[in-house]
Amino acid sequence: MKELALKYGCNPNQKPSKIYMADGSDLPIKVLSGKPGYINFLDAFNGWQLVRDLKKATGLPAATSFKHVSPAGASVGLPLTETLAKIYWVNDMDWQNFSPLACAYARARGADRMSSFGDFIALSDVCDKDTAMLIKREVSDGVIAPGFTQEALDILALKKKGNYNVIQIDPDYVPAPLEHKEVYGVTFEQGRQELAIDDALISNIVTENKELTEEAKRDMKISLIILKYTQSNSVCYVKDGQAIGVGAGQQSRVHCTRLAGQKADNWWLRQCPKVLELPFKDSISRAERDNAIDVYIGEEYMDVLADGEWEKTFTKKPEVFTREEKREWLDKLTDVTLGSDAFFPFSDNIERAHKSGVKYVAEPGGSVRDDAVIETCNKYGMVMAFTGIRLFHH
């Protein structure tokens, strides 16, 4: 297949639309079901590169959950804990025997479930039965993978009356070294972003604390790979092999750090016993529970706790989750890694990161205020690596 006609471009009025290879060669994909759209393919191709890089860097199966050309979550296939199974709403499944790929998607989807609603999924490995079962129960636009078992295809065929978007990509496809983009009739050309995210990239430790564990190295590389395919400005908080907060597309770096930090905080607050024990009605769906929890742990908690409101969601009225209780729980979050796609211009980013348990930082360096940023890291005993490489993505 040399080209594929699409229903429309970014918006319904943008017609005609298609994807094709400029050199006239065959597309490196097969659409196995559904009719993916323009934005679906943007998510699919960016997501595929991300999980391909994660697999190459870690040796582990990887998954990502994309929305509007940025990852809402991404992870490698480490086993789930009982608590994670609960907050990711998979504790009613045989989660202890999930395949590594299924664990990766459960983590990628579960980190920021509000943002992942209606995601496009990318998988580094052949989609298996376990992963397909997870995908089947979530609201999602589609999935791209290098292959699918027949069991997985049969399961995915049950989504959207057989119209769920399933794309198979050739894992051996290598794009041309130059890429092109057209804006307002003007063609832009640049070399592809083929930077290898490896141990050498994070070897320049500039802080007093230079103790970088193997797990921290892994998480640093994961954060940088995620940023490589996230709309800039971007920062990413990572813990235990998965993104727990991605801040994308903000003009101010500290607002990126705050946004991603709040997402990381929410991920951790969802694990507090007070939240785990919320008395939901049996009729409340997973998506409705996600929405209720998001409000409950935020500042607008009375929107779900006011008389006449809580009865719609809970069997009994929950107690308020006070600021003091939340801070006490957040103080237990430790050993988080923070990556940034460009340098931190001020130390306020580090101050904010500290509140979300950050111990390890990877950023390019190069700010005139690098000394102040390093000093703040030293104040909190953090380990910071200067990569020397910017990772803007647009």
Task: Show the residue positions of the predicted features.
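Active-site loops and adjacent core secondary-structure elements that bind or stabilize anionic groups
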Residues: M1-L201, A216-S234
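Gly-rich Lys/Arg/Thr-decorated short loops/hinges at beta-loop-alpha junctions or inter-strand turns
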Residues: D23-K35, A111-F117, G191-K210, E288-E309, ...
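Conserved helix-loop functional segments at active or binding sites
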Residues: D53, Y229, N266-R270, K355, ...
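Flexible, glycine/charged-enriched surface loops at secondary-structure junctions
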Residues: A57-S65, V166-I169, S232-K239, L269-F280, ...
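Active-site-proximal loop/turn and secondary-structure-junction residues that shape catalytic pockets
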Residues: S70, C127, K239-Q242, F344, ...
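Glycine- and Gly-Pro-enriched alpha-helical subdomains that act as flexible
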Residues: A72-R113, I244-F346
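C-terminal binding/interaction regions
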Residues: D119, L123-S124, R137-I167, D172-V174, ...
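Bateman/CBS regulatory modules and CBS-like beta-alpha motifs in cytosolic regions of diverse proteins
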Residues: V126, I205-E215, F344
